[in-house]
Amino acid sequence: MSIFDGKKVIIIGDRDGIPGPAMAECLKGTGAEVVYSATECFVUTAAGAMDLENQNRVKSFTEQYGAENMIVLVGAAEAESAGLAAETVTAGDPTFAGPLAGVQLGLRVFHAVEPEFKDSVDSAVYDEQIGMMEMVLDVDSIIAEMKSIREQFGKYND
């Protein structure tokens, strides 16, 4: 049984990292339902913060389906951007500018290069969709940053 079984997934891809459609393709056959997918330019947004519209989507889908049923997947090219996105969906918007300012959802959040995601999807599809980007990203830094955020702020660390 995958951590994605029966979960509602919000994908926040990165134009310079892992795009949304690549992660969505990997999720086929996992039992997860992608309820929203976007591909952003993290370096284009204010200091790498999560786009206000995406914050609104995360908030409304979490209200609709329940935080315990949600997983957020990010594809940011850099650990710092991935960490900001993860912090936003767990502890609230650190810039205090968006709908998640002061809202501690504590959601499950993973990066596409983390073993929790990679080991839950078809390896051939992963290699085809994400393998090339995995080679150029600083995977160890991304994993360390994501793990740190989950340990500090995650409510659903199963």
From Swiss-Prot:
One of its GO terms (cellular component) is glycine reductase complex. Signal peptide: none annotated. GO terms for molecular function: betaine reductase activity; glycine reductase activity; sarcosine reductase activity. The keyword Chaperone does not apply. This is Glycine/sarcosine/betaine reductase complex component A2. Belongs to the GrdA family. The lineage of its organism: Bacteria, Bacillati, Bacillota, Clostridia, Peptostreptococcales. It comes from the Bacteria. InterPro entries: GRDA. Pfam families: GRDA (PF04723). In the first step of glycine, betaine and sarcosine reductases, the substrate is bound to component PB via a Schiff base intermediate. Then the PB-activated substrate is nucleophilically attacked by the selenol anion of component PA to transform it to a carboxymethylated selenoether and the respective amine. By action of component PC, acetyl phosphate is formed, leaving component PA in its oxidized state. Finally component PA becomes reduced by the thioredoxin system to start a new catalytic cycle of reductive deamination. Keywords: Oxidoreductase, Selenocysteine. Monomer. Component of the glycine, sarcosine and betaine reductase complexes, together with components B and C. Its EC number is 1.21.4.2, 1.21.4.3, 1.21.4.4. It catalyses: acetyl phosphate + [thioredoxin]-disulfide + NH4(+) + H2O = [thioredoxin]-dithiol + glycine + phosphate + H(+); acetyl phosphate + methylamine + [thioredoxin]-disulfide + H2O = sarcosine + [thioredoxin]-dithiol + phosphate + H(+); acetyl phosphate + trimethylamine + [thioredoxin]-disulfide + H2O = glycine betaine + [thioredoxin]-dithiol + phosphate + H(+). The active site is at U44.
